[in-house]
Design a protein with these regions (language model features):
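Glycine-rich, proline-tolerant flexible connector loops at the mouths of alpha/beta enzymes
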Residues: 25, 30-31, 42-65, 96-104, ...
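Catalytic alpha/beta core domains of metabolic enzymes, predominantly
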Residues: 127-130, 135-282
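Alpha-helix-loop-beta-strand connector modules within alpha/beta enzyme cores
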Residues: 55-77, 110-122, 182-193, 277-281
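Active-site mouth loops of central-metabolism enzymes
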Residues: 15-33, 52, 71-79, 135-148, ...
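Hydrophobic faces of well-ordered beta-strands that scaffold small-molecule active sites
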Residues: 18-24, 49-51, 73-77, 95-97, ...
Length: 345
């Protein structure tokens, strides 16, 4: 088990529930726009949010943002250690840096000391795109070994400053390399791991890459917090993260829809019905499993674990619960009958 750190009110590692993170894409110095976006993220289920801090103006916006939100705030700082110190003074809940790119050891120590005094953890965040040139040369490219060695080198700088309140990420856009790097870290250290696939792309491909790269690790017991990085509205990152956690069996924050792929036994137009059920389930927050099946012969049995479901036939279908048929229903009333039953649960 990894050691536990505390990010504001959210525990990370040490057996705590895997938390969901996202990052704002607003200019941090635009406090109103940033707060509005964070409030939307909160409503979607985000539990930790990060903002970029490239300037002093952005750093000085931290207290105002922090005062207007309800989830822990992380400052993402590169190169200028003074920005990290300003964020610490501003009440940020976590700092993301790479100790190796903020200057001398004295500067690293200044950040570590400031964070220690206020019990603020630091995430060492390594990305494949900014990997040290000597490591790229040593390993012949961006490899899992290079990513892990980079992260461990940055961690060592903090440890030499007597700082151990650390979280680590090693993100790469190539899923197999990404996963292998996290596996190496999991073997070598007990710091909590922040999972993600960087530059995953637009939702269509990015969610798929993240589901494999993040979900594959979570199913093996690796990972303590996650961000799904998408070229999209950050709210979509949170929705995808919740779905990944649900698919991995780690969290059920709402209904789980299961539906068969259909075959030659299907006697009704199932796809529009499945889509309608999916649409209406978005307003349901019950942690239930709902099934839409293609035939009355196998449907109820195959979906016997579902709390409630429907299976279509020619002109009519079956409404069932836990594999037991409740009644026959005309095809055009199947969805309404299903939701009447859901309302009873």
């Amino acid at each position: 088990m990894t050691r536990r750190i505390q990010v504001g009110a959210v525990p990370v590692g040490g057996g705590a529930a895997v938390s969901i993170q996202s990052m704002c894409n607003t200019p941090t110095e635009d406090v109103n726009a940033t707060v509005r976006q964070i409030q939307r993220l909160e409503q979607a289920g985000c539990e930790i949010v990060r903002v970029a801090v490239p300037t002093e103006e952005a750093a000085r916006a931290i207290p105002s943002i922090k005062a207007a939100i309800h989830i822990p705030l992380v400052a993402d700082v590169h190169f200028d250690y003074r920005l990290a110190l300003l964020c610490v003074d501003g009440g940020v809940d976590k700092i993301r840096i790479n100790p190796g790119n903020i200057g001398s050891k004295d500067r690293v120590r200044a950040v570590a000391d400031a964070c220690r005094e206020r019990n603020i953890p630091i995430r060492v965040g390594v990305n494949g795109g900014s990997l040290e040139k000597d490591l790229v040369q040593k390993y012949g490219g961006v490899t899992a070994e290079a990513l892990a060695e980079s992260a461990l080198g940055h961690v060592r700088l903090l440890e030499e400053c007597g700082f151990g309140d650390i979280c680590i990420s090693v993100k790469c856009s190539r899923v197999p390399v990404n996963m292998a790097a996290y596996e190496l870290l999991h073997e070598k250290v007990d710091y909590p791991l922040h999972l993600g696939v960087t530059e995953a792309g637009t939702p269509e491909m990015g969610v798929l890459k993240s589901a494999i790269g993040i979900g594959g690790l979570l199913c093996r017991g690796i990972g303590d917090t996650l961000r799904v990085s998408l070229t999209a509205d950050p709210v979509e990152e949170v929705v995808a993260a919740k779905r990944i956690l649900q698919a991995c069996g780690l969290r059920q924050t709402g209904p789980d829809l299961i539906a068969c792929p259909t075959c030659g036994r299907t006697k009704y137009d199932m796809l529009p019905i499945a889509r309608e059920v999916e649409r209406r389930l978005k307003s349901c927050d019950k942690p239930i499993t709902v099934a839409v099946m293609g035939c009355v012969v196998n449907g109820p049995g195959e979906a016997s674990a579902a709390d409630v479901g429907i299976a279509g036939g020619k002109g009519e279908g079956l409404l069932f619960a836990k594999g037991t048929v409740l009644r026959k229903v005309p095809e055009d009333q199947l969805v309404d009958a299903l939701f009447e039953e859901i309302d009873k649960l």
